[in-house]
């Protein structure tokens, strides 16, 4: 089993695009595991890079990393965010109507895809973040908070939010009726759109990321690499693979990863691997599956390595 001294984990929040299947919750631990168990001077290949959480964490830790994802839409979004400023980030928040218009639009620009990403439920780009009953109320409130207070985080401390969170507004009967129907006091809760913008701002502030040159290759393109560290986060076995561009053959991938393990350090993220040539080397006991179904919440994230004899 690999070791992890959690006292050495970088302080501060994890960074990366709010992306479906992102490893942001455990990215700091994964990179620290690499640092504590292997030669961190080796080049790290983040081959299924997704929203860039592992890549960004490597950069924050001063490690050399190659950011790759087969889907150029996600790497284009990543590069767009790190090249822009805070005022541009504010333009990404959109209403339900605008979301639906962009969703039907073809072709989509990088900014279009970012707007769908930030404003979609589960960051899956297809359905709006809030239900129909809530969408206008929460969107309008988020826009008002940005315009009046210029904040993404800490929005619950603004007078605008506190006022909106009250169940009654003296003298405004129609508003009171609406608030009562929605159960505003109990349900207003989080304004996820502002929280998403905060994540983008954290990413944008990492100037060192501008030096990255992302690639969009299939994993087989790295077959000739030797003497490196590979962090692999492929589509998991027996799960939906919406976030992966194209079909994915898990067994073919395991064959490739096993071969690569003979001349490289290869770490694979998964819940389980059916191929007996791989063994679990670390388990993130607090990072559980959020997938739907009977097994939801029971499976934990793990790291696997090949057993080379």
Residue ranges: model-predicted function:
Residues 5-6, 237-238, 243-309:
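Long, positively charged, glycine-interspersed low-complexity recognition regions
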Residues 30, 44-58, 67-71, 114-128, ...:
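Conserved proline-anchored active-site loop of SAM-dependent methyltransferases
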Residues 1-45, 49, 53-54, 60:
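S-adenosyl-L-methionine
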Residues 70, 205-221, 244-248:
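Adenosine-cofactor binding site in Rossmann-like domains, unifying the SAM/SAH pocket
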Residues 61-209:
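Class I S-adenosyl-L-methionine-dependent methyltransferase module
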Residues 31, 35, 55, 250-258:
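Short amphipathic alpha-helical segments and helix-helix/interface helices
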Residues 40-44, 63-64, 208-212, 262-266:
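Short active-site oxyanion
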